[in-house]
Amino acid sequence: MKLKVTKLEKAAILPKYVHSDDSGLDLSAIEDLEIPPGESQLVPTGIAIELPPNTEAQIRPRSGLALKHQITVLNTPGTVDEGYRGEIGVILINHGKNSFKVTRGMKIAQMVIAPVIRVEVEEVDHLSDTTRGSGGFGSTGLTSD
């Protein structure tokens, strides 16, 4: 399966897997910018992609940035639809207490290519019963007892 990538800027870095068994391709910033504490920024990557049929790209945080700097992807996972052909941008948010400097070439997120199942929506008067029912938002408790 091929992911077609166009560099929109000469200095853009192609997404790549670091290890042969990685799930996500690293995405890199194309410019320097600073994210103050509590704020978010759209970080450009300088690339556009053409996804294989019936797939999406999920933009996810990098665990090292989250743990060491409290930087994460704001709308995680960000969804890139199959038909989108514009620049891939990553919305990073700084949950830390210090400003964070994004530098050109820095790995800022990872992109996972995933299959998409499209469904036909059917309106019904009633849904089937289950043991869970409408219980949600913590209804199963916090412990594994």
Swiss-Prot record:
Q: Which cofactor does the UniProt annotation name?
A: Mg(2+)
Molecular function terms from GO: dUTP diphosphatase activity; magnesium ion binding
Q: Name the catalysed reactions.
A: dUTP + H2O = dUMP + diphosphate + H(+)
Q: What is its EC number?
A: 3.6.1.23
Any one Pfam family match given in the protein's UniProt record, by short name:
dUTPase
Q: Quick one: which pathway?
A: Pyrimidine metabolism; dUMP biosynthesis; dUMP from dCTP (dUTP route): step 2/2
Query: Where would you find the membrane-spanning parts of this chain?
Result: none
Q: Which InterPro entries match?
A: dUTPase (IPR008181), dUTPase-like (IPR029054), dUTPase-like_sf (IPR036157), dUTPase_trimeric (IPR033704)
GO BP, one annotated term: dUTP catabolic process
Which family is this protein grouped under?
A: Belongs to the dUTPase family.
State the protein's name: Deoxyuridine 5'-triphosphate nucleotidohydrolase
Tell me the organism.
Gloeothece citriformis (strain PCC 7424) (Cyanothece sp. (strain PCC 7424))
Q: What is the lineage of its organism?
A: Bacteria, Bacillati, Cyanobacteriota, Cyanophyceae, Oscillatoriophycideae
